[in-house]
Amino acid sequence: MRLNKYIAHTRHCTRREASRLLARGEIKVNNKVVKEESYRVMEGDEVTHLNKPLQEQIVYRYLLINKPKHFTTDIGDKDSKYIMGLIKKEDPTGLIAVDHMGPKSVGLLLLTTDKALVEKLNQKNRKVRRVYLIELNKDIEEKDIKKLLKDRKTLKIESASHVDGYKANYIGLEMTIGSENILKGVINRMGFEIQRIDRSYYAGLTKKDLKRGWIRPLQEMEERMMKHFI
């Protein structure tokens, strides 16, 4: 990493201010004065300002996207568009999706550089509240909806019902344990096919005021709320 960028990442000052410190000869690397902004800081190097150690602080990124249809989080899916293609103004370096969403899935998706958070969210039996609107290939009766609520080791559906204002082939569903792939498998074995699955809520986050295909960083309050819910 370039030295001026490293200094900025310690939150000691901005990158522009770091350039001034370097020009004044106030920065040392391994006890030697360095004035070049382009100097590469290597792992194990000690960087100091006026003999006070500067340590890089990891700043994680959290991006919320309202995913449109035909995009996928699977880079190996040759028949669909990779989700990172939507990120034009953001640096995709290190970003990963918190969970899998295929081409028929739309709605709320979180991208982050925080690998520990992703691992936590995907722990087996970790309860993470998610809300979906699901369009099926045919009408579904109440008796079949009740079958969805059956307890399973790999899937926990908290509620499922028809939705006011939608046809009988739509259901609203809330689950806390399991993946979309597991949910799709259960629905397929019941004789139905999912035409579209739209996620509106995930771990305290919503897609309110976020248009389809749009992306924005999480606000600090949203980040705290999300971590509170998990």
Question: Which stretches of residues belong to each language-model region?
Answer:
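Basic, flexible Lys/Arg- and Gly-enriched helix-loop patches that mediate nucleic-acid binding at interfaces
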Residues: 1-230
